[in-house]
C-alpha cells in the first residue's frame, strides 16, 4: 500500500546523522512542543538538547584531535607510510570531517532552528554521507588488503604499495561522490513552524525516492560491504588456522596477525556503532511507529550519536592496538612545534624490533611498499 503524501511531502528528511532535521514538528524533543504555542519547549526537549550538545562536544574534541594526530603522524614519519596506514589516513580524514560538523548540529539542537544558511546546510549533509560511504568503503578495502597480505603474500608484494593505496583512496572518494554530490544538490533550507529546517528535497514522488534512497544506502553502505568483510576474514581465519608460519619469519607473522587483528577490531567497532542507526532508519521507513513517542525519539538520537562516536573511537583504538601509532602520538606530544627527532624515534623503534615488526618498521626498506 502506497503511503499518501502529506502536505509539504516534497521536503523529505536526510537519511542518517541529520535525520532529526526532518522531524522538528514531528518529534517533540527536536523541536517545539507539539501541544504548546509556537516557541514553547518542553523540559524533556531541552534536557535532550543539552545532553546531545554535551555528547557532541566531547566527540568533536576527541575526534578532531585524535584524527588530526593520526593524519599528521602518518604524513610526518616516513616509516608510517605503509599501505595499511594510507587507508587509515583516509579513514581519519573522513572521521575528522564528520566530527567538524558537530558544533553546527549542537547549535541547531539548542536553538531549534538552522541559523547557518543553505551553503553550510549543503556542506554538513553531504559530509555526513561522504563520511558514511568513505568509511565503510575504506574498511572494506582494508579487509581486502589484509586478506591479500595473509592469503596471497607473493601477490601482496605488487598490490600492497602506498602508491596503489593512495590511488584506491582517490577512487573511494570519487565513488562516494556518486552519493555525496546529489545530496549536496538536494540539501535545502526551508521555513517550518517558525523555524528554519536543513533537509533534503527529493524529486517527485518524494516518498518513493526517499524510501529507495534509504534502502539503497542500507544495502550498499552497510549490508554488502559487511558481507565482503566477513568473507575476507573468514578466508583469513581458515588460512591462519591451517598454516603455522605465513611469511617464513616469526616476527613478520606477529606483525601480520597483530595488524589483521587491529583492522578487525576497527571494523567491529564500526559495525557496532553504525548498525543501530541503519536498522533504525529502515524500521522508521517501513514500519508504522509512533514518531512522537519520547522513547522512539530518544532512541533515534542515541543511534545518531553512536554513529558519530565511532569517528572519535578509531584514534583511541589505533593508540591501544598499534605500538607505532602509540610511539608517534607520544613523539608528537613531546615536540608539537619542533621537527621530529629521528634518533629518538629510531631508538624507540629499535627497542622493540626484536619483539615485533610493525607498520612503522616495514620489511622492504624506507618506502614501506609492501609492509604489513
From Swiss-Prot:
One of its GO terms (cellular component) is neuronal dense core vesicle. Detected in oocytes (at protein level). Detected in brain cortex, hypothalamus, hippocampus and olfactory bulb. Detected in oocytes. Disulfide bonds join 121-198. A lipid is attached at residue 333 (S-palmitoyl cysteine). Residues 1-47, 111-122, 187-206, 285-299 are extracellular. Glycans are attached at residues 18, 33. Residues 347-357 have a biased composition (Basic and acidic residues). Residues 340-372 are annotated as: Disordered. GO terms for biological process: adenylate cyclase-inhibiting G protein-coupled receptor signaling pathway; adult locomotory behavior; cellular response to growth factor stimulus; cellular response to hypoxia; cellular response to toxic substance; eating behavior; G protein-coupled opioid receptor signaling pathway; G protein-coupled receptor signaling pathway. The chain crosses the membrane at residues 48-75, 86-110, 123-144, 164-186, 207-238, 262-284, 300-321. This is Delta-type opioid receptor. The gene is OPRD1.
Amino acid at each position: 500500500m502506497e503511503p499518501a503524501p502529506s502536505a509539504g511531502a516534497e521536503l523529505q528528511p536526510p537519511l542518517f546523522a541529520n535525520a532529526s532535521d526532518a522531524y522538528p514538528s514531528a518529534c517533540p524533543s527536536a523541536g517545539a512542543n507539539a501541544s504548546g504555542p509556537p516557541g514553547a519547549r518542553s523540559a524533556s526537549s531541552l534536557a535532550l538538547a543539552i545532553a546531545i550538545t554535551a555528547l557532541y562536544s566531547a566527540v568533536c574534541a576527541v575526534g578532531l584531535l585524535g584524527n588530526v594526530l593520526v593524519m599528521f603522524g602518518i604524513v610526518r614519519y616516513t616509516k608510517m607510510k605503509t599501505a595499511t596506514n594510507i587507508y587509515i589516513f583516509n579513514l581519519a580524514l573522513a572521521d575528522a570531517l564528520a566530527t567538524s560538523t558537530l558544533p553546527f548540529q549542537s547549535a541547531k539542537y539548542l536553538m531549534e532552528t538552522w541559523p547557518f544558511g543553505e551553503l553550510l546546510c549543503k556542506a554538513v549533509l553531504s559530509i555526513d554521507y561522504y563520511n558514511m560511504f568513505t568509511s565503510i568503503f575504506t574498511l572494506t578495502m582494508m579487509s581486502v588488503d589484509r586478506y591479500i597480505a595473509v592469503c596471497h603474500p607473493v601477490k601482496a608484494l605488487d598490490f600492497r604499495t602506498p602508491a596503489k593505496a593512495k590511488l584506491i583512496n582517490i577512487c573511494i572518494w570519487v565513488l562516494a561522490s556518486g552519493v555525496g554530490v546529489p545530496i549536496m544538490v538536494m540539501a535545502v533550507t526551508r521555513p517550518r513552524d517558525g523555524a528554519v529546517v536543513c533537509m533534503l528535497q527529493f524529486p517527485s514522488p518524494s516518498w518513493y525516492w526517499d524510501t529507495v534512497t534509504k534502502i539503497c544506502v542500507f544495502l550498499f553502505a552497510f549490508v554488502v560491504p559487511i558481507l565482503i568483510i566477513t568473507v575476507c576474514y573468514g578466508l583469513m581465519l581458515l588460512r591462519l588456522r591451517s598454516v603455522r608460519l605465513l611469511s617464513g619469519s616469526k616476527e613478520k607473522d606477529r606483525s601480520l596477525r597483530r595488524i589483521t587483528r587491529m583492522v578487525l577490531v576497527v571494523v567491529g567497532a564500526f559495525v557496532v556503532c553504525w548498525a543501530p542507526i541503519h536498522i533504525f532508519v529502515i524500521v522508521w521507513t517501513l514500519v508504522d511507529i509512533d514518531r512522537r513517542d519520547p522513547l522512539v525519539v530518544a532512541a533515534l538520537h542515541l543511534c545518531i550519536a553512536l554513529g558519530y562516536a565511532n569517528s572519535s573511537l578509531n584514534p583511541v583504538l589505533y593508540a591501544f592496538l598499534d605500538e607505532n601509532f602509540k610511539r608517534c602520538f607520544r613523539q608528537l606530544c613531546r615536540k608539537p612545534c619542533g621537527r621530529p627527532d629521528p634518533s629518538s624515534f629510531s631508538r624507540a623503534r629499535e627497542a622493540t624490533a626484536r619483539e615485533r615488526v610493525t607498520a612503522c618498521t616495514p620489511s622492504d626498506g624506507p618506502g614501506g611498499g609492501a609492509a604489513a
